[in-house]
Each structure stands twice: as structure tokens, then as C-alpha cells.
């Protein structure tokens, strides 16, 4: 059982993108849900609007399935939850699983959330801080606050590390022979 990374209240994952060390890759995946109320599905979960949400409609566990076309490196999962707005619909226990498909998913994180308000940053790294490579991520809501039945999740973002490009990173020319060719006339 782990506790998610503590971030300042309202720490927007877009701040991660501004560091140019990660980029959001949710649009490259196929998203599916175990259930949803009409008008409260994947579109609301991915619309960048914190006022909209996915609402499940069925028995627990409630599942969000995220499938990539190729094996993908994932570093961080960000979930927006708001206990003040959602009360008993707010998740209190979440499991994050990864694998090649539905049949070989393995749990890599289980989170206990206590009245969350804002972005929850979940590292998807191994013990050596190395990002996970996977075809599929599954987020399972195992329990809600106040023993609520259905759940609300307002947003989910998935981030991959940005690989440094070698373009523009040439060794310094220090010898006389190299310095002769360092500029174009």
C-alpha cells in the first residue's frame, strides 16, 4: 500500500509538461470503462475540464482501461479527484495495474486516498526509478469514501519521459584543425 506523491494543492500536471521532461500521451491510447452513466464517460474524463467527470454505473471494482497500440514507456499517472464536490463518489482505494492485455495485468501500485482534493500524481516506476513499459494500464477503484457505490473521476493524464535529442549537441571544437571549419563563409 503506497501513498501518492504529495503535491501542492491544485498542482497542475501541465507544470510537468512545461519542464519539457515529460509529455502527455493519453490521446495515443484507446480508453474504455467498466460502466458509465449516459453523458459521463471517457469524453468527460479526457476533456481538460475539471467541472466534468466520469461517473460509473454498476458494482465495484470500477475500471478505467487504457490500451496502447505499441509497448509504451509511462512515467507518471495523474488523477484529479475532489472530495468536496463528489463526497461519497470520491475514490478512497485505487489499484493501478499494467500488462500486455487484460489476462496478464499485475498490480504495481495500490493507493489509499483520504479526502483528496486536486491532482494525485502516481509514479509508474520500478524500484530503480525506471519508467514502466507496457501495452495496457488499468485503474481500478476498489472503494469509495463513505462506502459509496458509484465513483467520480474528473480527469486522468498519462505521461511519458521526453528523450533528449542529440541534435544540436555537438562536441566542442577545441583543436586548431577543427576550429578552421567551425563557421561557414
From Swiss-Prot:
Please provide the Gene Ontology terms (biological process) for this protein.
anaphase-promoting complex-dependent catabolic process; cell division; protein branched polyubiquitination; protein K11-linked ubiquitination; protein K48-linked ubiquitination
Enumerate the spans annotated as DOC domain: 2-185
Q: List residues, modification N-acetylthreonine.
A: 2
Record's keyword annotation contains Cell cycle? yes
Q: Which Pfam families match?
A: ANAPC10 (PF03256)
Q: Respond yes or no to whether keyword rRNA-binding is given for this record.
A: no
Pathway involvement? Answer: Protein modification; protein ubiquitination
Where are residues bearing N6-acetyllysine located in the sequence?
169
Gene Ontology, cellular component aspect: anaphase-promoting complex; cytoplasm
Q: Which UniProt keywords apply?
A: Acetylation, Cell cycle, Cell division, Mitosis, Ubl conjugation pathway
**Cross-referenced InterPro entries, in alphabetical order?**
APC10/Doc1 (IPR016901), APC_su10/DOC_dom (IPR004939), Galactose-bd-like_sf (IPR008979)
Q: What does this chain do? A: Component of the anaphase promoting complex/cyclosome (APC/C), a cell cycle-regulated E3 ubiquitin ligase that controls progression through mitosis and the G1 phase of the cell cycle. The APC/C complex acts by mediating ubiquitination and subsequent degradation of target proteins: it mainly mediates the formation of 'Lys-11'-linked polyubiquitin chains and, to a lower extent, the formation of 'Lys-48'- and 'Lys-63'-linked polyubiquitin chains. The APC/C complex catalyzes assembly of branched 'Lys-11'-/'Lys-48'-linked branched ubiquitin chains on target proteins.
Complex and partners: The mammalian APC/C is composed at least of 14 distinct subunits ANAPC1, ANAPC2, CDC27/APC3, ANAPC4, ANAPC5, CDC16/APC6, ANAPC7, CDC23/APC8, ANAPC10, ANAPC11, CDC26/APC12, ANAPC13, ANAPC15 and ANAPC16 that assemble into a complex of at least 19 chains with a combined molecular mass of around 1.2 MDa; APC/C interacts with FZR1 and FBXO5. The C-terminus of APC10 binds to CDC27/APC3. Interacts with PIWIL1; interaction only takes place when PIWIL1 binds piRNA. Interacts with FBXO43; the interaction is direct.
Family of this protein: Belongs to the APC10 family.
Kindly give the PANTHER family that the UniProt entry links to this protein. ANAPHASE-PROMOTING COMPLEX 10 (PTHR12936), ANAPHASE-PROMOTING COMPLEX SUBUNIT 10 (PTHR12936:SF0)
What protein is this chain from? Answer: Anaphase-promoting complex subunit 10
Tell me the organism. Answer: Mus musculus (Mouse)
User: Which taxonomic lineage is given here?
Assistant: Eukaryota, Metazoa, Chordata, Craniata, Vertebrata
Point out the gene that encodes the protein.
Answer: Anapc10
Amino acid at each position: 500500500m503506497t501513498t501518492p506523491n504529495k503535491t501542492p494543492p491544485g498542482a497542475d500536471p501541465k507544470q510537468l509538461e512545461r519542464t519539457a521532461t515529460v509529455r502527455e500521451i493519453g490521446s495515443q491510447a484507446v480508453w474504455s470503462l467498466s460502466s458509465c452513466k449516459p453523458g459521463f464517460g471517457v469524453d468527460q474524463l479526457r476533456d481538460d475540464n475539471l467541472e466534468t467527470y466520469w461517473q460509473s454505473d454498476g458494482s465495484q471494482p470500477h475500471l478505467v482501461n487504457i490500451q496502447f497500440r505499441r509497448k509504451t514507456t509511462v512515467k507518471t499517472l495523474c488523477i484529479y479527484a475532489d472530495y468536496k464536490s463528489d463526497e461519497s463518489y470520491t475514490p478512497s482505494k485505487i489499484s493501478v495495474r499494467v500488462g500486455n492485455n487484460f489476462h496478464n495485468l499485475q498490480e504495481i501500485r495500490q493507493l489509499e486516498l483520504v479526502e483528496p482534493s486536486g491532482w494525485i500524481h502516481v509514479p509508474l516506476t520500478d524500484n530503480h526509478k525506471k519508467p514502466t513499459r507496457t501495452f495496457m494500464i488499468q485503474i481500478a477503484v476498489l472503494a469509495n469514501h463513505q462506502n459509496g457505490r458509484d465513483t467520480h473521476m474528473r480527469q486522468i493524464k498519462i505521461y511519458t519521459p521526453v528523450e533528449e535529442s542529440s541534435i544540436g549537441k555537438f562536441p566542442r571544437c577545441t583543436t586548431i584543425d577543427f576550429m578552421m571549419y567551425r563557421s561557414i563563409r
